[in-house]
Amino acid sequence: MIAIIDYNTGNLKSIENALGRLGAEYDVTCDEMVIRSADRVLLPGVGEASSAMENLRRTGLDKVIPTLSVPVLGICIGMQLMCLHSDEGDVDGLGVFRSRVCRFTPEDSSPEERIKIPHVGWNSVSAAASPLFRGIPDGAWFYYVHSFYAETCADTIASTTYGKRDFSASLRRGNFFGVQFHPEKSGATGSRLLSNFLSMSL
């Protein structure tokens, strides 16, 4: 069973639909015992980092998530919350990944690309060998919606570029994974990534 952590950060229907198409059993929950008994854990979400962290603290899940031993996948703000710190609300994160979250600025534009904020659209991803990207060709395209990004660091397993800004498309540390893009909105390639997450053995 997959636990989808519900911490009041917006509509979870798209990730539920994506898991349903893969035939996966899931439970949307904020219950610690359900989360600890799950085979996989998803931390999705959209919204603002400081309020999202406050919701995790209020439920005590900020202490639970970093101690999980099963595969955990953070999506979009879920990945950002697993980093050391976010400039969005100047808030400390869960500290799983050794990255900091920064805001795109107009200075990130390049001569070839004047960026818009938020970044909305498709970007190709350069990925290292990882069970999360098994069977996905290097340079595959994924769908993004975000104004903040995680800096590249030792935990970066995939990166992309917006304007002249390189940033982490995906992070991994042990059993913890994160993706900045939305696999549930990225067509067949995103479905393959979710399938890899559901079937991987660590």
State each model region's role:
Residues 42-44:
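Structural motif
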Residues 34-35, 64, 170:
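Structural alpha-helical scaffold elements that stabilize or flank donor/cofactor-binding regions
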Residues 1, 26-37:
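Short acidic low-complexity segments
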Residues 21-28, 54-57, 122-128, 160-162:
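Short gly/ser/thr-rich secondary-structure transition/capping motifs
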Residues 2-24, 183-185:
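N-terminal beta1-alpha1 ligand-phosphate binding loop
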